[in-house]
């Protein structure tokens, strides 16, 4: 009897220990991931993954940190003050890596897919209606607003010039933020612009300029923005970085099922618009229904060919010495591992 009681006691203790361990595991605190955002619709994957509980399902807690631009995320990514963020692959990014700032491009965040020209070449209405502007060749001698020096939009303008048989320097770039594009076009300070949504739609509604072409028409699939990981996040918290990527890819696939006909008009469109109005700086649901949204690869694939084209442009214009190139800053292993777990993207089928 004593032996039976001892055995029963040991069994009870083991079961109790197992249950306690299970409760402890369930109660384990979530891993915090600090993510840099600019609050625009291009941050949709972060917002969707949070709203849909994809980060929570991976045991992650998202800490969103707002920045004025992606460029300002570079330094904190390198120091570990920021784990992930979104930004453009610019001259500044290449030079930061050259100086020893540790970060990697790990997935697509925005590209100009067919029908999804999130940015456009706008031309003053007066020039179009008068017949002075009819083709890309008519960019010669014009003042074209672009949002900054040493960024992909310079390469975009260069591609537009090439379509007209022109070269860099045949048009005059005028550097100004997107918020300055509407008044500059309205008062004739510039003749044309490379402008992102929603500012592009605002300008067209204002009536000062017309959309000559979406960027997807003259520079298709340009790698416009990317998901960045800081080196400390990669080296010190790789399992967490992989969990983040799984949640990100799930969100990107949900986002893709919101797209149809160059709008957020797919099956998931209403829910994505609802999420964007909650999380982003733009709160107008009706505007989201009419603007052209960005394309994001459902597998997170990075367009290395586009990055190389832009890098070559920066090098040819003397902005880079070429010592650090696209292959030095891209790490596709996280996206590849996440996609391997989910399988190929099938429209309308949630990644689980």
Segments (PLM) and residue ranges:
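Bacterial N-terminal signal peptides that target proteins for export
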Residues: 1-13
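Secondary-structure end/capping motifs
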Residues: 235-322
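Bacterial N-terminal signal peptides
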Residues: 10-22
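Short, glycine-/small- and polar/acidic-enriched structural segments
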Residues: 28-167, 172-175, 191-197, 213, ...
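Short, hydrophobic alpha-helical packing/hinge segments within bilobed ligand-binding/sensory domains
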Residues: 73-74, 92-93, 181-184, 199-200, ...
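Conserved C-terminal helix/tail region of periplasmic/extracytoplasmic solute-binding proteins
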Residues: 308-352
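Periplasmic-binding protein-like
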Residues: 111-120, 204-233, 237, 245, ...
